[in-house]
């Protein structure tokens, strides 16, 4: 069944597992959280097999400061400053819980791994964009704290491009058929 499903998905999207679920299961409403992975390639050439990465040729990033900033963004906070408004602000709470925000180096690339119970529109890309600015010295970890506490989106927060972002996993409540 998994192979048959894969034939209907576009290139780059590949389901890994199929499970039988009950009639009350809802793909969105039954989810308890998600893991996003954002990959930036710091080398000169893009790997041929990785189409979904941000290319930052020959960029040097301060990983220690970026992880400090990621730690500030971890926890339960109002993430309004890291959301791009798109009309849901009256119905969706800006308070979200980020369980994990880690930076994982893999050769010439760096993965931003973010897990949480919910996300606002463009929140992950905005947080990654802010951390990239910390890594290049445009912002400091204390700037990230001030931005988070301000609860206001400003031009200082620039969203990272979409092509580095991947929904890596959806965490579900126990789902039995």
Task: Describe each model-derived feature in a short phrase.
Residues 1-177:
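Structured-RNA-binding interfaces characteristic of tRNA pseudouridine synthases
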